[in-house]
UniProtKB/Swiss-Prot annotation:
The keyword Nucleotide-binding applies. Pathway: Purine metabolism; IMP biosynthesis via de novo pathway; 5-amino-1-(5-phospho-D-ribosyl)imidazole-4-carboxamide from 5-amino-1-(5-phospho-D-ribosyl)imidazole-4-carboxylate: step 1/2. The keyword Nucleotide-binding applies. NCBIfam families: purC (TIGR00081). GO terms for biological process: 'de novo' IMP biosynthetic process; cobalamin biosynthetic process. This is Phosphoribosylaminoimidazole-succinocarboxamide synthase. Its EC number is 6.3.2.6. It catalyses: 5-amino-1-(5-phospho-D-ribosyl)imidazole-4-carboxylate + L-aspartate + ATP = (2S)-2-[5-amino-1-(5-phospho-beta-D-ribosyl)imidazole-4-carboxamido]succinate + ADP + phosphate + 2 H(+). GO terms for molecular function: ATP binding; phosphoribosylaminoimidazolesuccinocarboxamide synthase activity.
Length: 239
């Protein structure tokens, strides 16, 4: 298997063609960004941490019957994944009030929701990734109604598994962002990554943060927070 040409470079990853048909080579970057790229810094070791954590979580979800694009970890900073067409929606699941929800609605951070809330955001940097309703999604024509229902169902299943996974190691899953893609056959797969870049993760007892808010809000050392998550998960799960 050979790493091919660069197809796409985003804020946190580079995507390369693979010599195997239907597969792509993902390379994580040490770059940390926030506020739609307005804040940016290179943090040594971040690529390895995100790759390790995301690989571990995708492998764990696969064992629970939740399909994703993940095939295997290739190196400290690389993964092999199935090629999918990414749906331009971020699916956000919230268990506790935090971040933009607290700011948007004027609710104090840390309040547990009576039930998980699923939100959709339209992936468009120029528009600032706006919050959209299911009616907006229909107008944008980026996903059929039955696909939206499936996205919500899959997001709920991921939430249930991640809550249990993190609770086992004393971590509270506050909220997280998912992305999905379609295979050539039309199957919906979980895609992108699941890491402290895409999840808010607090210590269950102390409420210490182990996620990108460390960088976003200047709350502490990002690499130390991510390493804490990897160390806790690594004690119980192995790819």
């Amino acid at each position: 298997m050979v790493k091919g040409e660069l197809l796409y470079e985003g804020k946190a990853k580079r995507i390369f063609r693979s010599s195997e048909e239907g597969e792509l080579w993902v390379e994580y970057k040490d770059d940390a960004t926030a506020f739609n790229g307005e804040k940016k810094e290179t943090l040594a070791g971040k690529a390895r941490l995100n790759n390790d954590i995301s690989s571990l979580i995708f492998a764990t979800l696969a064992k629970k019957g939740i399909p994703s694009h993940f095939i295997r970890r290739l190196s400290d900073t690389e993964q092999l994944v199935k090629q999918v067409d990414i749906i331009p929606l971020e699916v956000v699941v919230r268990n506790v009030v935090a971040g933009s929800m607290a700011k948007r609605l004027g609710i104090e951070e840390g309040i547990a929701l009576k039930k998980p809330l699923v939100e959709f955001y339209y992936k468009d940097d120029a528009l600032g990734d706006p919050l959209v309703t299911e009616d907006h999604i229909a107008i944008l024509d980026v996903a059929a109604a039955e696909e939206v229902a499936q996205l919500k169902q899959m997001a709920a299943a991921v939430n249930n598994e991640l809550i249990e996974l993190f609770a086992t190691v004393g971590v509270q899953l506050i909220d997280f962002k998912l992305e999905f893609g379609r295979t050539q056959a039309g199957e919906l797969l979980l895609a992108d990554e699941i890491s402290p870049d895409t999840c808010r993760l607090w210590d269950k007892d102390t409420k210490e943060r182990f996620d990108k808010d460390l960088f976003r809000r200047n709350l502490g050392n990002l690499q130390e927070g991510y390493q804490e998550i990897l160390s806790r998960l690594g004690g119980l799960y192995h790819v």
